[in-house]
Amino acid sequence: MIKILNSKSKNFDLALDKLLLARKNKIKLSSVSVAKIIEDVKKNGDKAIIKYEKKFNKNNIIMPTSKQINKSISLLDEKVKKAIDLAYSRIYQFHLLQKKKLSNISYTDKLKNKLEYKYVPLESVALYVPGSTVSYPSSVLMNAIPALVAGVKRIIMINPGQQGKQNSAVLYAAQKCKIKEIYSIGGPSAIAGVAYGTKKIKKVDKIVGPGNSYVAAAKKCGISEIYSIGGPSAISAATYGTKKIKSVDK
């Protein structure tokens, strides 16, 4: 439900301050909770991850089998597959052209010092793809394809599901991007798992992709290199003399 504040109301300033304070307190609270989860995963590894998966996602599976993945993909509507195929080809073409525009620099100065500037792909990267009750195959494509084009050797996906079941469209997009290492986990514990590494999860060099406020808080802890702190999408709209407020929420 969208929150509407009327600037003409007598209590507008107070209501706005209250809203901003509540958001600030939520961020502080999530940061404290996240720090405890990260420390738990650091000490107890897979055991801690499973504990939080059971608690938040009713899941006790860290890594789905190939059979489970293929079965899920087989249930996906062909129209959705074609849409993902089209998006993949367009995004891939763009980043391929982008790569061709990049050039290394190498020269020797008057003092015979050889100076170089090189573009070198990372060894490994983890894509965080939000899940549970929603589907974001676009997050897979937008984050995996640049890594694929760059030549990153190991691309893994962490995507929370409900009771171990992940979204078919997300899994198909991952398959399209040649991602063979897929984990059915999410939240701060997943971020900590790929950042520190566990017995089942090998650590990565970088973590990319959006997430909720708790995932964003985990990234802020500086436990791994990140692309950005992509938290939940938010919008604040100011309207003047219009009654079509509901249209903003669509």
Give the residues covered by each predicted segment.
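Flexible, glycine/proline-enriched loop segments at strand-loop-helix junctions
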Residues: 23, 38, 130-134, 155-161, ...
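Conserved NAD(P)+-binding/catalytic subdomain of aldehyde/semialdehyde dehydrogenases
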Residues: 178-250
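Conserved active-site and cofactor/substrate-binding residues in soluble primary-metabolism enzymes
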Residues: 29-32, 36, 44-47, 79-82, ...
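Glycine/charged-rich beta-loop-alpha catalytic/anionic-binding loops adjacent to active sites
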Residues: 121-130, 174-177, 198-201, 222
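Short secondary-structure capping/turn micro-motifs that flank functional sites
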Residues: 57-58, 163-164, 190-191
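Conserved small-residue-rich beta-alpha loop and adjacent elements
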Residues: 108-172
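Alpha-helical scaffold segments in soluble metabolic enzymes
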Residues: 36, 40, 51, 83-86, ...
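N-terminal Rossmann-like NAD(P)+-binding subdomain of aldehyde/semialdehyde dehydrogenases
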Residues: 1-123
